[in-house]
Regions:
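Hydrophobic anchor at the beta1->P-loop junction of P-loop NTPases
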Residues: 3-5
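NTP-dependent small-molecule kinase module
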Residues: 94, 112-121, 125-138, 152-211
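P-loop (Walker A) phosphate-binding loop of NTP-binding proteins
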Residues: 8, 20
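ATP-dependent small-molecule kinase phosphotransfer cores
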Residues: 32-98
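ATP-binding Walker
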Residues: 11
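Residue-level signal for inorganic ion chemistry
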Residues: 31, 81, 100, 143, ...
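Walker A/P-loop
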Residues: 14
Length: 211
């Protein structure tokens, strides 16, 4: 059984993933993996350089200015980069042997096809906006621009199997404990836990209708 965790920007999905560590659950971070692969994969480096230009990497480091300029030239350019990076992340996750993964673009990227169940972390719009403004020190308008690049929260809620509400008031741990795919790990032995992608350490969940 493989589980995906998603949520729009500012929803607090990474916070929920950190709470899962209390159950000994290790979560594969798709965003971190993408950054690592862009930096280390010879295949990705070659394909991005062919796509963007010879100044894509400077002294082995991704030239973010060149990438940003490339993205501004056409809406299709982001899709072209994704077509290079996403398959590599999919393969890396499959080869990792891990059974839990976190992705902000679970459905947009198609990586949801690699998991059996999806948990969505949600929060009210204004809460999300405020979190991102404080975290990244950016304007409200910039946050809204980023949000527009992701599926609407309500659409993701409809597709996900479970929902964890992270509005700053709801008990996160109580909601996590209610998810069957988490509670079943409580009595696993150490060796079995490791084989399931978790370490030796090991109520108000909303179940969503699958679409």
């Amino acid at each position: 059984m493989k589980i995906g965790i998603t949520g729009g920007i500012g929803s607090g999905k990474s916070f929920v993933c950190r709470r899962l560590a209390r159950y000994g659950i290790e979560v594969y971070d798709c965003d971190a993996a993408a950054k690592r692969l862009i930096r280390t994969s010879p295949k990705i480096r070659q394909e991005l350089t062919t796509l963007i230009g010879c100044d894509t990497y400077i002294d082995g480091t991704l030239n973010k200015a060149a990438v940003a300029q490339f993205l501004l030239q056409s809406d299709d350019h982001a899709k072209a980069i994704d077509a290079i990076v996403h398959p590599a992340v999919f393969q890396d996750f499959e080869e990792s042997g891990m059974t839990w993964m976190e992705s902000a673009i679970m459905y947009e990227s198609g990586i949801y096809r690699l998991v059996d169940k999806v948990i969505v972390v949600t929060a009210p719009l204004e809460v999300r906006i405020d979190r991102v403004m404080q975290r990244d020190h950016i304007t409200r308008e910039k946050v809204l621009q980023w949000m527009q690049r992701q599926l609407p929260q309500e659409e993701v809620r409809k597709r996900a199997h479970y929902e964890i509400i992270n509005d700053g008031k709801a008990d996160i741990d109580a909601q996590i404990a209610q998810i069957p795919e988490i509670s079943k790990y409580r009595n696993l032995g150490i060796s079995e836990c490791r084989n399931n992608g978790i370490s030796k350490h090991r109520n108000n969940i909303t179940k969503r209708k699958t679409i």
